[in-house]
A protein has these predicted regions:
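An acidic, low-aromatic, low-complexity terminal/linker signal
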Residues: 1-185
């Protein structure tokens, strides 16, 4: 498997990209639709000791161990109680090192909205101020009708965490994931 993850689906005319949108509080975010593998309801997450607060643990999804992060915590947003709309987006993230394989990552979000087709001419660079989100995590700002959608760079959101080291086959038993995550940090 190569280390690149296609980041956006292009429309037939090649001038639009498709994004799955979701909410964290009142803010709407978007991820390139081709990076999203599936959307699942909130299921039990097995916690990992001695990991950052935003790393909620791992899930076993059809025999595959998938690390799960809470995007609210990662972005420094206040925590809220989970609701019936809270779900996990399973996304494909490029490996951090050149030549390393991509891996799947679960992202807990407040709710999923819709798939938007955004014209590239309506995507602007992110502002350089006033956000708790690292600038490398923002791909751009999508203008859609009367709102702005924060478009995330999933490879940056999921990178620099060592999470690919704890992703894998549940039956392979890849050692102690918490220790691997600590060593990668």
């Amino acid at each position: 498997m190569n280390n690149t993850v296609r980041t956006a689906a292009r429309s037939d005319d090649g001038n639009h990209d498709k994004f799955l949108t979701f909410c964290l509080g009142q803010e709407e975010y978007g991820l390139p639709i081709l990076a999203v593998r599936e959307i699942i309801g909130l299921i039990d997450v097995t916690p990992l000791p001695q990991t950052p607060a935003y790393v909620k643990g791992v899930i076993n999804l059809r025999g595959k161990i998938i690390p799960v992060i809470e995007l609210r915590s990662k972005f420094g947003l206040p925590t809220v109680a989970y609701t019936a709309e809270t779900c996990i987006l399973v996304v494909e993230v490029a490996g951090e090192e050149e030549g390393s394989a991509s891996f799947q990552l679960g992202i807990i979000v407040d709710s999923v909205r819709e798939v938007l087709d955004i014209s590239r001419s309506n995507i602007e660079p992110p502002p350089n101020f006033g956000t708790s989100i690292p600038m490398s995590a923002i791909q751009g700002m999508g203008k859609v009708k009367d709102k702005v959608v924060i478009l995330l760079n999933i490879n940056s959101v999921g990178a620099k965490q060592g999470l690919e080291k704890i992703s894998g086959d549940a039956e392979a038993g890849s050692g102690t994931p918490a220790r691997q995550l600590q060593q990668a940090a």
